[in-house]
Each structure stands twice: as structure tokens, then as C-alpha cells.
């Protein structure tokens, strides 16, 4: 199974006592059996430098729509083929995902046919139903619910329900602890809308991979969840 990791961070994170610098990324990907890694950091320049040094790493532009230069900077980054969408973290950056200043970011992504990976699973700004307001406004957008609700069963069920209501929503598995919910998600919305991510280096990729592998997926479903789905969404393959 060729693995595409849809959710990875690069940089120094002293609060968590973890780090993954550009010099260690290639080895980290190889050691964890990851063929393609989608990486991000609020320091987009660091990500750009990294993806141009590591062939099998690709960037997601960290979009903070409260930044007045966000949209123009996003266009600049998406002109670079090494950038394949955006990461948004409304909880960390402090905004509701359907604020009017978010809309221009989504409209740029629609122009490019690229997705937004949005952190999903914590109040007050990243509950699945809050993100659903944005999804409903832009049914042509491609929205990934990062962590598919994270660690709370109510939010996990909510994320699966939102995806079942909206064909433009994908689920990403990192940090969500229950293998059984990955199987449920595939059964409810299909293997073409569920994708593996690790949240490395905060989480161990091999542990996150095992969680998916133990979900009881059919071999064909496992191939899609571990890489095929993300490849199509980010690269059109």
C-alpha cells in the first residue's frame, strides 16, 4: 500500500517538545513508509523552503484569513505546484469558519480546484456543525475535516454525519482514536472520501497507520484510505 499522509507539521514545537525540521523530513517520511507527505506550518516560507528540498513533500498554505494579506499571499503560493491546498485552524487563529473574511479564501480554492484541510473537533470554532455552515455556503468547495472530530464521540459522529450530508466533504483520520469509526465512515460515505493522516510529529505515524489497518477495511478500501483518496484530491491522480 502506497501511503500518502494528508496531515503533517514541520518545524519546532516547544510546547509539545517535538520537532521535525527540513533536514530530518526526508528520513522521517522514509522511516514511516510515507510515499508522499502533505506538510504545513504557520510559517509558510519555511514550508516553501522545505518542499523544494524534499521531493516527496508538498505544502498546504496555512491560511489565517484574519491576515489582510492572506488572499494575495495564497494566490502567490498556489502558483507554485508544490502547494496543493490550504490548512485552516479556526481554533488556533480565533475565528468562526463561516466568517465573511473566510469566503475569499474558499473562492480562491474553488478557482484552483484544491481543498481546504480544516481542523475539526474542538469548541468553540472547530465543531463539525460550525464547519458545515461554510460547507453549505460553498457546495462546490472541497473541504476536509481534519481529525474527523478528534477525540470526542459526539464530534466524531457529527463529522461523519456532516460528510454524509455533503458530497464535498472528506474525513481525515489523524488523532481520532477509534478504528471502528473509520470503518463506519467508509461504509457510510465511501472509500473515496476518507483519508489517512498522522498529525506527525505530534502523533506517531506508525501508530496512526496501525489504527487504520486494524479498522477491518477490505483490502481495496485500505488502499484508497491510506493513499489513493488523498492522491486524487490533492493531485487529481
Residue ranges of each PLM-predicted region?
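Residues at secondary-structure transition points
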Residues: 20, 68, 96-100, 125, ...
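Conserved, mostly hydrophobic/aromatic
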Residues: 7, 29, 77, 86, ...
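Mid-to-C-terminal alpha-helical segments outside catalytic/metal-binding sites
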Residues: 1-10, 15-36, 191-193, 206-237
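Active-site gating/metal-coordination segments in enzymes
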Residues: 36, 44-117, 165, 169
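Hydrophobic faces of well-ordered beta-strands that scaffold small-molecule active sites
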Residues: 3-8, 36-39, 58-61, 84-88, ...
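Active-site environment of divalent metal-dependent phosphoester hydrolases
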Residues: 11-14, 44-46, 66-69, 93, ...
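A general structural detector for well-ordered alpha-helical segments in enzyme core domains, enriched
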Residues: 21-28, 46-50, 73-77, 101-105, ...
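Catalytic pocket-lining loop regions of alpha/beta-barrel enzymes
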Residues: 98-196
Amino acid at each position: 500500500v502506497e501511503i500518502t499522509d494528508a496531515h503533517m507539521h514541520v518545524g519546532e514545537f516547544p510546547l509539545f517538545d517535538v520537532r521535525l525540521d527540513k533536514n530530518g523530513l526526508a528520513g522521517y517520511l522514509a522511516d514511516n513508509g510515507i510515499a508522499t507527505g502533505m506538510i504545513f506550518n504557520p510559517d509558510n516560507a519555511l514550508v516553501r523552503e522545505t518542499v523544494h528540498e524534499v521531493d516527496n513533500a508538498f505544502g498546504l498554505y496555512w491560511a489565517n484569513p484574519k491576515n489582510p494579506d492572506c488572499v494575495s499571499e495564497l494566490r502567490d503560493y498556489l502558483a507554485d505546484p508544490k502547494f496543493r491546498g490550504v490548512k485552516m485552524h479556526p481554533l488556533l487563529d480565533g475565528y468562526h469558519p463561516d466568517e465573511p473574511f473566510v469566503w475569499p479564501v474558499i473562492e480562491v480554492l474553488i478557482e484552483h480546484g484544491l481543498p481546504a484541510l480544516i481542523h475539526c473537533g474542538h469548541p468553540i470554532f472547530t465543531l463539525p456543525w460550525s464547519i458545515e455552515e461554510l460547507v453549505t455556503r460553498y457546495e462546490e468547495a472541497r473541504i476536509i475535516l481534519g481529525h474527523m472530530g478528534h477525540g470526542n464521540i459526539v464530534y466524531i459522529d457529527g463529522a461523519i454525519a456532516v460528510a454524509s450530508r455533503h458530497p464535498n466533504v472528506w474525513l481525515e483520520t489523524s488523532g481520532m482514536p477509534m478504528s471502528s469509526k473509520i470503518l463506519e465512515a467508509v461504509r457510510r460515505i465511501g472509500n473515496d472520501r476518507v483519508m489517512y493522516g498522522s498529525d506527525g510529529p505530534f502523533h506517531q505515524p506508525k501508530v496512526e497507520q496501525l489504527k487504520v489497518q486494524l479498522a477491518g477495511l477490505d483490502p481495496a478500501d485500505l488502499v484508497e484510505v491510506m493513499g489513493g483518496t488523498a492522491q486524487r484530491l490533492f493531485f487529481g491522480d
